């Protein structure tokens, strides 16, 4: 993987990441394709209509169904899905954490029961890497020990220690296997700034046979904490992350979350929000959120967002989307998802342009000003 910083404005960064499959201009939003597909969209939509340079797949879900070995036999995620650009795969730690009583964390790894059929499985750091090799993702996340917040200092400390040990085991396994995939470590520590520093410094210091991690992520946020506390935690963490490697904030979030994190030095983002909100009838616009089911759109011939040039806004009206949503037509999910993802992808492109031109603060001020014009659902 190649990485370069193109411009810095304050702490906001515009960078370029090159993998085997694509060039990624940051800040970047990565659509979530949990089961090797972004919900309601296919690879052509992602490449030709949305021009997304990278999407996510999920190790936990793909391991259980259809199985990572099957995907490997069918050409990895790129051959299997038809999406020929970059894939990042999560380790499955968050999904295991979400299983509640059906999961057990030990120093060796994670025992869990499948949400599909109740069968019992074990993820070690090494096994997760092997699964990700079968998926052949461009960027592989290591297994981490994610905990609920708030939590005790003892449990947060244990999470950091275990996450660091698992990261080192992952790095050793990766180097010894001699594969070319890129490996990212995940910083934990809850919302305790000192624990975040310890976690970041511990992970950054890890090396094996001269190899270190290709990038670093901030994990364990956006799990119920107040927004400002999340922003403060990010701000307390990024100074301890290498300047010459990508910085990824996992599972975040709203447009506001993204612009605040960019201001604090983050490069990469993912979240299910654009597609989930689309399916539920909430569409992102320059001025706020539009609830498409509202009766006032029944005869509205205007596009979702007059400032948007996405495929949906160029070709279809609010009235048509209102009808499709109420009729529960499957076409609605595709058109709405295209719009919301375009909004996110275009949003980070605009942020990048502002950074390159040295006007990030002005762009941020304008962003909030436009949303304040109609902060309620329109």
Curated annotation (Swiss-Prot):
Belongs to the queuine tRNA-ribosyltransferase family. Its cofactor is Zn(2+). One of its GO terms (biological process) is tRNA wobble guanine modification. InterPro entries: ArchSynthase1/Queuine_TRR, TGT, TGT-like_sf, tRNA_ribo_trans-like. One of its GO terms (molecular function) is metal ion binding. Gene3D superfamilies: Queuine tRNA-ribosyltransferase-like. Catalyzes the base-exchange of a guanine (G) residue with the queuine precursor 7-aminomethyl-7-deazaguanine (PreQ1) at position 34 (anticodon wobble position) in tRNAs with GU(N) anticodons (tRNA-Asp, -Asn, -His and -Tyr). Catalysis occurs through a double-displacement mechanism. The nucleophile active site attacks the C1' of nucleotide 34 to detach the guanine base from the RNA, forming a covalent enzyme-RNA intermediate. The proton acceptor active site deprotonates the incoming PreQ1, allowing a nucleophilic attack on the C1' of the ribose to form the product. Pfam families: TGT (PF01702). PANTHER family: QUEUINE TRNA-RIBOSYLTRANSFERASE (PTHR46499:SF1). This is Queuine tRNA-ribosyltransferase. Its EC number is 2.4.2.29. The keyword Transferase applies. Residues 251-257, 275-279 are annotated as: RNA binding. GO terms for cellular component: cytosol. Substrate binds at residues 90-94, 144, 188, 220. Homodimer. Within each dimer, one monomer is responsible for RNA recognition and catalysis, while the other monomer binds to the replacement base PreQ1. Binds 1 zinc ion per subunit. The active site is at residues 90, 270. It comes from the Bacteria. Keywords: Glycosyltransferase, Metal-binding, Queuosine biosynthesis, Transferase, tRNA processing, Zinc. It is an enzyme of class 2 (transferase). Zn(2+) binds at residues 308, 310, 313, 339. It catalyses: 7-aminomethyl-7-carbaguanine + guanosine(34) in tRNA = 7-aminomethyl-7-carbaguanosine(34) in tRNA + guanine. Pathway: tRNA modification; tRNA-queuosine biosynthesis.
